[in-house]
Structures are given as C-alpha cells and as structure tokens.
C-alpha cells in the first residue's frame, strides 16, 4: 500500500566512489515551514534553499507509521487540512506525464519515494539541480 505525506519531501540518492574536495556553494535564499498532519499535530520541518548549484529540499519529519511514502511538489502554495487538496495538482511546468518512471518523462513534482523505519523518523536532503525558487517556471510564484 502506498502512503502519502501531505508535505513535500525528498531523499538524497547518491553514491561516492572517491573523495573529492568540497565545492563552494553559495546559498541565496532559505524558506522553512513547519509540517502538520490533518489533525494539526506537528509532523516535522521542511526547508527549501536556493543555491548556486540548484535548489536543495531538506526534511526532518515523523511519519504516521513505518513504510514507504510518496513525495510530490504541488502547484499551489496552499496546504489546508484535513485533506490537503488545496495544494492542487503536482507541480508540472513542463507539462510531462504522471509517474516517476513514466517513459514520457515525469512531472517535475514527482519525486522519489521515502522509507520511514520502525521509529517513523525521516531525515533527508534532495538536490534539484535544474530548478530555481523564482523566475520563469520557478517553484515560487504569486500563490507561494
């Protein structure tokens, strides 16, 4: 069964075979938001930052239960309980198809799933190298 968190969360999928010097990354803007469940209880904290190498999404959360959760960025800057449908459809400025593995290309808002272990804790970072917070097709627009 696939579960959905009413938040945007993103895991880092990276492997490293050799150590290389860290590159300097400039951070120009950081936005942080508390995450809440449908009943209003605290679920975690998410942040999104504009960096010189793209956008970084970070999350520290407590899932409702252990398991796999789908992650998505939504089109509207509104996320009201109890069903969170106010967030609108998945963010899709390039008009692609739904599904991370869609052969026609996935929505920009379709993100990798995340696993919550038995302790329900989720801590992740995910870099979106081709994204910007503002500007044409930016994540932030008039509705946030």
Predicted regions, residues:
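Positively charged n-region of N-terminal signal peptides that target proteins for export
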Residues: 1-4
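Bacterial N-terminal signal peptides
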Residues: 6-15
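N-terminal leader/targeting pre-sequences
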Residues: 16-144
């Amino acid at each position: 069964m696939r579960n959905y968190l009413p938040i945007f969360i993103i895991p880092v999928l990276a492997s490293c075979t050799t150590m290389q010097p860290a590159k300097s990354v400039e951070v120009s803007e950081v936005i942080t938001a508390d995450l809440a469940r449908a009943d209003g209880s605290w679920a975690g904290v998410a942040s999104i930052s504009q960096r010189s190498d793209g956008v970084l999404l970070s999350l520290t959360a407590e899932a409702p239960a252990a398991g796999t959760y789908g992650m998505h960025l939504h089109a509207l800057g509104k996320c009201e309980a109890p069903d969170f449908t106010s967030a609108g459809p998945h963010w899709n400025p390039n008009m692609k198809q739904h599904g991370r593995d869609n052969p026609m290309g996935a929505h920009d808002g379709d993100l990798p799933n995340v696993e919550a272990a038995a302790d329900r804790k989720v801590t992740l970072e995910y870099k979106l190298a081709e994204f910007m917070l503002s500007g044409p097709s930016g994540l932030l627009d008039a509705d946030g």
